[in-house]
Structure formats: C-alpha cells, structure tokens
Amino acid sequence: MGEQAASGDRLFRSIAAAKPKLVTGVPDGMLAETIRLCAASNDFPYIACAREEETIGVACGAAMAGERAVVLVQNAGLLNSIGAFATMALRYQLPFVVLVTNRGVLADPNSYDIEKYMAFEASVKTLTPVFSYAAASLPDDLVPAAFKWAEAARRPAVIALEKSL
C-alpha cells in the first residue's frame, strides 16, 4: 500500500471511530482513498457534493439536527465556502469536523497551490482555530478528538492535513 493510500485508510479509520451520521465532500486527490472508503462504508453515507459550500450546508443541517458530520475539502474549497461557513456554522455555533487538505505548504510547492495556502492562512485562521497535522502520520484518535473539541467549543473543528517533507 502506498503512502497516500495508507494515510487515506488511517484517516478513514479515524473518521469511522468518531461515528459520524454522515460524511460529505468534493473530490480531492489527497483525499481520494479516504473518499473511496467513505463511499463504500456501511456505517454512514458519503454525500458527494458539486460545490464546497454545499458540503458546509449539509454539515450544518446535520449539526442542527444534533448529528455528527465530517466535511472533506481542499483549502481553496473552504475559502469558496467562507460565506456559508461564517453565516451558518460559526453564527449558529454548529459543531462538526472539517478535514482540509492544505495545499501549497512547503512540501507541496506547486505554483498553482501557493496562493491557496497564503489565502487560507490569511482568512480562515482569522475566523477559527485551525489544527494542522502531517497527512502521513495522523493520530488514530484525530477525528474523535476533533469532535470533542467542536462539541465543547460549539463551533466547527478545522483540521488542516498537510504533506510533509
């Protein structure tokens, strides 16, 4: 199993351990294995969305109903969703987990991703804390711990998953 597949499996197991009611997201190369495993899971549905702000809406609806939801997006996708994130998730203190692939970091220096990283750093982190982890070495209890934090803080927990050197 390759490094990306192994980290995708590890992330899936952490998501499953948190027992979410649903997982929602849009396609992303770093999350491809996790998305595949979520879509095949019998424990929760994977709701594929066309736009990132739809994932925030789905998660907000679940949280309003008292259910756990996980969002899978890229940093640029969360930036696209910032209006929905601020006016729904933050305004109404809705706890859910957002797993963000943080593109453009030092170990991911594609020229087209660097601005995504800079914009993410400059905007999302002014709204809510962002907890960063190396995608290749995620703790097993990452998503359960993120839910505990989100539920205590009464706001989404944003986890930035980053490639490492």
Q: What would you call each of these model-derived segments?
A:
Residues M1-L165:
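Thiamine diphosphate
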